[in-house]
């Protein structure tokens, strides 16, 4: 096997994401004629500690959301540094990209520029070897297909409705394969649409393909999902569990949690009580961002009360950053990390965060963003690292479905080697 292949060109362009905002797409060309491509996602609710996504700010073009500066940074500064490098030396290339930027948040060149290049390099290397990306990144032991954490009711920043919490999801832990898991979720999704219609609710979709009805309360979102699970022929708490992304930083104001649509203002301790009541009442297996990104004491209390029963996922809390993750591990905040490639900005740093989480006994959930493209890198990544869980929206809208279809292909390619761990994917809890 050739272990040295030069990069001969790097080309970036501005494309559109699923929310009709510009994003960066990068192509890396190799001396043997191989090309690798990657497109960068973008978030709606973003953590304050995320790597910086460079936007042009020109209000006359795409409402200031253009990314031509990031594109130019790739085509000029980054391309000049990358041409002649060995495509198979991913750690070196990622280190060089970080040093080329020179800031601690990738604010000079832009995390969207840097990530696009990092992922395009990995794709080019895999293509040159004739390997699937998951095999190139994960090696021969890459074999675990993920339990989907499927967002089927959208609220918060992902929808214009009366639901405070951002995402209500289903997890088909009772399936025996990813193929079966996807079918189960699709059946519940269609049943939920009919259930909402029967109740007189609108069935318009949010950013991630979930329904965005004007429900009477946050709890009604869970009630109607459980009803749909039952009507679809499955058992809530056995075949399927509920997962929640509270995105609580979005309604954390002056040290309090303001649930406007319920007319409640809660302290950290009261917010923990709120979730504990839900966990005792409903078949909830995972809560993401239950507390705000700055409320470390609240996170610690939440973990003390619920950490043995429920997966507690840090998204805004950790932003895929090893420094923040290390602090969380030290003080006992959360027991899981959400992994978003564009929060940190390179493939190598992402893999480092996953490794640190696993060493500490944390699960890692590989995630999309609300602004997505047809890029399927995260589908390969979740199998490459045997994470066992993926969060990539509803089984609707092609930018979400593309990820699920890629996982079907991977499961087919792995054949008998493929593993679907179901409830065993939650090795961090005893429920």
From Swiss-Prot:
Necessary cofactors: Mg(2+)
Active site, per annotation: 208, 340
Gene Ontology CC annotation, any one: phosphopyruvate hydratase complex
Pathway: Carbohydrate degradation; glycolysis; pyruvate from D-glyceraldehyde 3-phosphate: step 4/5
Residues reported in the UniProt entry to bind (2R)-2-phosphoglycerate: 166, 340, 369-370, 391
InterPro entries, alphabetized: Enolase (IPR000941), Enolase-like_C_sf (IPR036849), Enolase-like_N (IPR029017), Enolase_C (IPR020810), Enolase_CS (IPR020809), Enolase_N (IPR020811)
GO BP of this protein: glycolytic process
Function: Catalyzes the reversible conversion of 2-phosphoglycerate (2-PG) into phosphoenolpyruvate (PEP). It is essential for the degradation of carbohydrates via glycolysis.
Name the record gives this protein: Enolase
Organism expressing this protein natively: Clostridium botulinum (strain Alaska E43 / Type E3)
């Amino acid at each position: 096997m050739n272990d040295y292949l030069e990069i001969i060109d790097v080309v970036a362009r501005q494309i559109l994401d699923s929310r009709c905002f510009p994003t960066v797409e990068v192509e890396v060309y190799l001396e043997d004629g191989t090309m690798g491509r990657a497109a960068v996602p973008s978030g709606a609710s973003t953590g304050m500690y995320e790597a910086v996504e460079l936007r042009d700010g020109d209000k006359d073009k795409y409402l200031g959301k253009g990314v031509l500066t990031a594109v130019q940074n790739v085509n000029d500064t980054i391309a000049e540094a990358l041409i002649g490098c060995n495509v198979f030396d991913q750690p070196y290339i990622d280190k060089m990209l970080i040093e080329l930027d020179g800031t601690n948040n990738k604010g000079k060149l832009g995390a969207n520029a840097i990530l696009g290049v990092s992922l395009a390099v990995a794709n080019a290397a895999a293509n040159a070897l004739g390997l699937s990306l998951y095999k190139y990144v994960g090696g021969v032991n890459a074999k675990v297909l993920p339990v989907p954490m499927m967002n089927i009711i959208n609220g918060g920043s992902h929808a214009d409705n009366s639901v405070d919490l951002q995402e209500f999801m289903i997890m088909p832990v009772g399936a025996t394969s990813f193929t079966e898991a996807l079918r189960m979720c699709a059946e519940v999704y269609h049943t939920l649409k009919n259930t909402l219609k029967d109740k007189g609710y609108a069935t318009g979709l949010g950013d991630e393909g979930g329904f965005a009805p004007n429900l009477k309360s946050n709890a009604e979102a869970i009630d109607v999902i459980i009803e749909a699970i039952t009507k679809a022929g499955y058992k809530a708490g056995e075949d399927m569990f509920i997962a929640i992304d509270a995105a609580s930083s979005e309604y954390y104001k002056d040290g309090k949690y303001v649930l406007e649509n319920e007319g409640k203002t809660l302290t950290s301790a009261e917010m923990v009580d709120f979730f504990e009541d839900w966990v005792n009442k409903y078949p909830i297996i995972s809560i993401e961002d239950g507390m705000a990104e700055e409320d470390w004491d609240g996170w610690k209390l939440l973990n003390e009360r619920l950490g043995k029963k429920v997966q507690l996922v840090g998204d805004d809390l950790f932003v895929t950053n090893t420094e923040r993750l290390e602090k969380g591990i030290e003080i006992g905040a959360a027991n899981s990390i959400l992994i978003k490639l564009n929060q940190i900005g390179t493939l190598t740093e992402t893999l480092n965060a996953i490794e640190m989480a696993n060493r500490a006994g944390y699960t890692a959930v590989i995630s999309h963003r609300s602004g997505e493209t047809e890029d399927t890198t995260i589908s390969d990544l979740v199998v490459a690292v045997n994470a066992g869980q993926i969060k990539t929206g509803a089984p609707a809208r092609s930018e979400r479905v593309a990820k699920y279809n890629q996982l079907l292909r991977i499961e087919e390619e792995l054949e008998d080697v493929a593993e679907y761990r179901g409830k065993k994917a939650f090795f961090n809890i005893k429920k």
